[in-house]
Amino acid sequence: MKMLTRLQILMLALFSKGFLLSLGDHNFMRREIKIEGDLVLGGLFPINEKGTGTEECGRINEDRGIQRLEAMLFAIDEINKDNYLLPGVKLGVHILDTCSRDTYALEQSLEFVRASLTKVDEAEYMCPDGSYAIQENIPLLIAGVIGGSYSSVSIQVANLLRLFQIPQISYASTSAKLSDKSRYDYFARTVPPDFYQAKAMAEILRFFNWTYVSTVASEGDYGETGIEAFEQEARLRNICIATAEKVGRSNIRKSYDSVIRELLQKPNARVVVLFMRSDDSRELIAAANRVNASFTWVASDGWGAQESIVKGSEHVAYGAITLELASHPVRQFDRYFQSLNPYNNHRNPWFRDFWEQKFQCSLQNKRNHRQVCDKHLAIDSSNYEQESKIMFVVNAVYAMAHALHKMQRTLCPNTTKLCDAMKILDGKKLYKEYLLKINFTAPFNPNKGADSIVKFDTFGDGMGRYNVFNLQQTGGKYSYLKVGHWAETLSLDVDSIHWSRNSVPTSQCSDPCAPNEMKNMQPGDVCCWICIPCEPYEYLVDEFTCMDCGPGQWPTADLSGCYNLPEDYIKWEDAWAIGPVTIACLGFLCTCIVITVFIKHNNTPLVKASGRELCYILLFGVSLSYCMTFFFIAKPSPVICALRRLGLGTSFAICYSALLTKTNCIARIFDGVKNGAQRPKFISPSSQVFICLGLILVQIVMVSVWLILETPGTRRYTLPEKRETVILKCNVKDSSMLISLTYDVVLVILCTVYAFKTRKCPENFNEAKFIGFTMYTTCIIWLAFLPIFYVTSSDYRVQTTTMCISVSLSGFVVLGCLFAPKVHIVLFQPQKNVVTHRLHLNRFSVSGTATTYSQSSASTYVPTVCNGREVLDSTTSSL
C-alpha cells in the first residue's frame, strides 16, 4: 500500500512540474469554478476558443462554452433541489476550461486527479505525539467528470482518468475511437459515435446521387476518425473521394485558403463533406468567402445549426446540408439562462467576459475603448438561441447523478446521506455496475416516447439519432430549417430544401450518360466513366451493360427491355403489290380470252392444226403462272409457302413441257422425212398429252420430295444492316428456290434447241418459228431476272416484285408469240382458217399432188419438199 502511495506521489510530482511549467509559459490567468459538496463532479468545457499563434486560449465561446457550462450548473442546482434524486446528498462541481485544445485540457485535468494523489490515509501518517497529520488545501475529491466537448480532448482526458478509475461522461465527443472499451474503459457519452453520423451523411449523398465529392477534416480524433468512418460508408455506396484535405492545428488563415484552392482543382466535385470542429468550419467558410467559392456543403454536427459559423459568409454557405444530434430544447434552461447577468452570476468567472463580448461593451470604464454596458441589457429571445447540445449536457449530469443515487441506495441502505462506504468512491464499481446500467426518462423532455429514454449501450454510447438542417434565406435573413432526420434510415423533405442555384446540384466525376448510353468505367475508379452509345438494337441491362435484343426484337423507348418487332411483308394495298397484281390480272384476262376463243373455235382447222390438247395444257400453265403472283404477294404462311414452292416450278414445267412436246414432235417428223423414215411414233394427240404429262410429273415428284425433306413454313428474317425490320418470309433460301427451277431450265434449254433446229421448216410449219421466238425471249427474260433477283436480295419488296413481273412476262411471251397470231386469224382473218391441198412455198418446189396420210386424223398430211426432200405438213394455211 505504501509503495502504491509513493508511486502516486511520484506521478503527481511529475505531472505537477509539467503543469506549473506550462502555466508559467503563458500570460493567461487560470480560472475555475469550485463549489463544494458531498460528492463533486468535474466539468470540462471549451469556454474559450482555440488561440492563435502562441496563445493557448482565444475569444469566449458563447454557445458551446458558456451555455454548456451554465447547463451543468443548472442541472446541479435542479438535482440538489430534487427530493427523490440523491436526497440528503449535495453535489458540488469543479469546472475547468479546455480552451478547445487537447493538450491544454490534459493540463487542466490534472486538477481532477490531484485529490487522488494527495489524499493521505490518516491511519498511516501520525505525528510523534500520536495525533493525526494536518492536511491543508486539500483538492476536491472528484466522483466523476462531465466532458469534454471535442473528441480529441475527451481522448486525452480519458487516458488520464482511467489511471485513477474516475468515470467520465461526455456530452459532445463522438469519435468512434471512444467506443473501444479496451482503451477507454471508464468513458461513456450521451451522444452516439460518429460512425452513425458518417452513415447518415453517406446516405444523404447517395440520396442525391452525389457520387464524387471532396472531404475536409479537422486534425484530431473527431475529424480524422469521423472522415475515416465516412469514407468507409462512402465506399459501400460507390461514392468516390475526389480530394481529401485536412486542416491542422495551426489555425493559420493560409492553411484554410490552401484547402479552398485544392477543392477548386476538382470542378466536378461540387459537394464538399466536412467533418470539422466548429472553429475550423467557420475559418474554412470564411476562406471560401474570400475567393467567392461556391460549393454545396454537407457538414457534421461540428457545424450543426450554429449561426456563428456562417456569420458574414452566409451567401457561400447558402444551401448547406448540416447534421445535428436529435435533441429537444430545455425550456427551463432558457428561463434560467435569460435570468443571468453579471450582477447576479458571481460563480461563473467567465461570465463577465461573455457579457462584454456578446453586447460589445465594457463593464469597466474605458476598457478596450468600448462604451460602458447598459445596466438594462439582458439576454432574451432576440439575442439568444439555445445551443443544440444543452440537452446532452443536462442528461450527462443526470446520468452521473442516477448512477450515484443507485450506488448510494445500495451501499448506504439505511441513510439518505453518504455513509463511510461512499466516502472513498470505487470508480470501477460506479462505472461498471451502475453507470452503464442506468435507464431513465430525460428530464425536462416534453416528449415521453422512446426518444426520451437516456441509457448507454455496452460500449457506453448513446443512441444514434440526427436531425438534418438546411441553411436557407427567408425574407433576407439566413436561418437553419429542419428538413429531415436520420434514425437507422434517412427521411428527407426534399421539397423544403433550398439550393444555391435553385436546383439540386450535381457532383459526379463524369456527366450522366444519355438514356441510350452505357457507362464504361475507368480502371480503378468506380465514379468516373466514359459514355458509350448503345447500338440501336441494344437495350440497357444496367447502367454499365448494353445487350443485343436479338433478331426480330427492338429495344423499348426507355431501353429497359425489348419487344417483338411487327412482321413486315407486302400488303395488298402497297404499291409494290398493286403493279404485279395488275399485270397478273391483265395476263389472266388475256389467257381467259384465248381459252374462250379456242373453245368457241375448237373445231376450226387452225385450232385443230395447233394441237388443241397441248394448247389447252399450255394455257393452263400460263394461267397458273399468273396465279403465282397472288401467292407471292399474299402474307406468308405454311400453306402459302407450300403453294409457292409447288406452283412456281410446276407452272413453268407445264408450259415448257407442252412446248417441248410440240417442238420434239415437229423435229422428229422432219428428221424422219429427211432420213426417209416412215411416220414417227407417238405423234398422235393422246401420245403427246401423255408425254407432256410425264414431263410435268417429273417436276411434281421433285417438288413433292423437296416439300417432304424441307417442311414448308415461315421465318422471321432480319437483315444485319436493317435490324429494325423483321421480314416474314418462307423458310426456304433464295438459292433453294432457284435450284428447284433447275428442271424447268432444262426444259427451256431443250425447247430452245428444238426450236432452233426446226427454224427452217416449211411455211406451214412456221409455228416452230413462233415457238423459237417464245423460247429466245424467255431466255432473255430469265437471264435478266437472275442477276436482279440476287442483287435485290436485301430488299424483299423489290425481289418479290421482280419475281412476279418476270413470271407474268413469261406468260405474256407465250400468249404473244404463240397464241396472239392464231387468235388474230381466227377473229380477224377467218378466210385463212381453211384447209389447203397444196402448200405455197417461197423457196421450196412442189414435187407432186397432195396425198393424205390419214383422212380421219385431226390433221391432214401431204407430201411436200423441204430442202429437196419430201416431208409431211399440215393442211392449214401459213400463219
Curated annotation (Swiss-Prot):
It is a multi-pass membrane protein. It holds the Pfam family 7tm_3. GO terms for cellular component: astrocyte projection; axon; dendritic spine; glutamatergic synapse; neuron projection; plasma membrane; postsynaptic density; postsynaptic membrane. SUPFAM superfamilies: Periplasmic binding protein-like I (SSF53822). Glycans are attached at residues 209, 292, 414, 439. Keywords: Cell membrane, Disulfide bond, G-protein coupled receptor, Glycoprotein, Membrane, Receptor, Signal, Transducer, Transmembrane, Transmembrane helix. Residues 23-576, 635-645, 710-734, 793-802 are extracellular. InterPro entries: ANF_lig-bd_rcpt (IPR001828), GPCR_3 (IPR000337), GPCR_3_9-Cys_dom (IPR011500), GPCR_3_9-Cys_sf (IPR038550), GPCR_3_C (IPR017978), GPCR_3_CS (IPR017979), GPCR_3_mGluR3 (IPR001234), GPCR_3_mtglu_rcpt (IPR000162). GO terms for biological process: cellular response to stress; G protein-coupled glutamate receptor signaling pathway; gene expression; modulation of chemical synaptic transmission; postsynaptic modulation of chemical synaptic transmission; regulation of synaptic transmission, glutamatergic; sensory perception of pain. It is found in: Cell membrane. Belongs to the G-protein coupled receptor 3 family. This is Metabotropic glutamate receptor 3. It comes from Rattus norvegicus (Rat). The gene is Grm3.
